[in-house]
A protein has these predicted regions:
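Bacterial N-terminal signal peptides that target proteins for export
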Residues: 2-9
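Short alpha-helix boundary/capping motifs
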Residues: 1-2, 14
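Non-transmembrane, aqueous-exposed alpha-helical and coiled segments at domain scale
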Residues: 23-198, 207-355
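Basic/polar N-terminal segments that are highly enriched at the extreme N-terminus
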Residues: 1, 20-24
Length: 355
């Protein structure tokens, strides 16, 4: 009899789980909708406005055990922004980070940042729908983030960055907004979102990827790129997204260099291999990347704008990556050489013969 009651109880609990999940999803969807409505009100745009970008960590953040992906549906329903239209991106964040929403209008340069109040998400759906915006969101900020505007209004930029108007997310959100407004490609922005922000290091990864793809194009299904990252910097996150060259699938091996080693091979940026897994052989390039190779326009304002401005002036070089890149060595790779470059205790630059 006791076992029977336990079984009935378990069945009832299992029956309740889908309903609880649906309730959580409805609440998150309503949250995304409220964020979009508030942004539309504050920025003065209508549904489907192609000038508007949305950035959010919805889908990454988990709030009191609730996943947050349904908030994206709420945004799309209200503002029309979507992943498919290339005007909604989800910068990567750890699941315990706050859930936030950011809307940017490139026609005005203005942006609104909203951070969810976790206490509001503990309400019933009916209670939640009745809450005013200042109880749904723990932080609501508005600022003009266009870099040209900020260059002429550094006092406003000082407030935005120094007072953390976007709760510490200022650099990444402002940089992504500005390159999106200037026509950055979808795949580049996807890689930027994976890195969780845009910086010149990610842009250098795009340049290197374009260069390698030109010199060592993939020609059949047996081929893939392998990366020996020595030294590593932000560029590696772009390779993982663009080439599926991840450490977990042995597509990337990351190693640091000492200051002395960096001096021995100036500007070295790693070893890039087109590997044929059927033939067990490949072609390799040891590359150098020199950020100072081109005399780019310089930012003259406060430090918060320097890398954002550099991101923008680097954009035209996507089609001219060789302006920054030098081939240090080209060589053939067999299985033994590849293993030596990948294995602990072996220095890949010494194996490649450049150190």
């Amino acid at each position: 009899m006791k076992m029977r009651y336990q079984t009935i109880t378990m069945v009832l609990l299992l029956a309740l789980v889908p309903g609880l999940a649906m309730a959580d999803n409805a609440l998150m969807e309503a949250l995304g909708g409220k964020a979009a409505q508030k942004a539309m009100q504050d920025l003065g745009f209508e549904k489907g406005d192609a000038n508007v970008l949305v950035l959010t960590d919805a889908g990454h953040a988990i709030v009191d055990g609730q996943t947050s992906q349904a908030a994206i549906k709420g945004i799309t329903n209200e503002s029309g922004n979507s992943i498919g239209d290339g005007n909604l991106f989800r910068p990567l964040r750890a699941h315990w980070k706050p859930l936030w929403f950011y809307f940017f209008d490139k026609s005005t340069g203005e942006a609104v940042y909203l951070e969810a109040n976790s206490e509001a998400l503990s309400k019933s759906l009916d209670e939640f729908l009745d809450l005013p915006d200042d109880q749904v969101f723990s932080k609501i900020s508005k600022a003009n983030v266009d870099i040209e505007y900020l260059q002429n209004h550094t006092d406003e930029g000082n407030v935005t960055f120094n007072d953390k108007a976007f709760n510490g997310n200022e650099f990444g959100l402002v940089a992504m907004s500005n390159v999106w407004a200037r026509g950055a490609s979808y795949d580049f922005l996807q890689a930027t979102a994976f890195h969780d922000h845009l910086c010149p290091g990610v842009t250098s990864g795009l340049h290197i990827a374009e260069f390698v793809e030109e010199k060592l194009p993939i020609t059949n299904s047996s081929e893939s790129y392998k990366v020996i990252s020595c030294p590593n910097w932000c560029k590696e996150d772009l390779f993982q997204m663009r080439w599926d060259a991840t450490p977990g699938k042995s597509g990337m091996f990351v190693m640091a260099l000492t200051d002395a080693e960096k001096k021995a091979v100036p500007n070295v940026a790693g070893i890039y291999i087109r590997w044929n897994d059927t033939a067990k052989e490949g072609d390799a390039l040891v590359l150098a990347y020199n950020f100072s190779a081109v005399d780019l326009p310089k930012w003259t304002g406060p430090s918060w704008g320097s890398k954002i401005y550099q991101d923008i002036v680097l954009m035209p070089y996507e089609n001219n990556p060789e302006a920054f890149i030098t081939i240090l060595k080209e060589f053939k790779v067999d299985a033994a050489t590849l293993a030596n470059m990948q294995n602990a205790g072996m220095h890949p630059l010494k194996v490649a013969g450049v150190m």
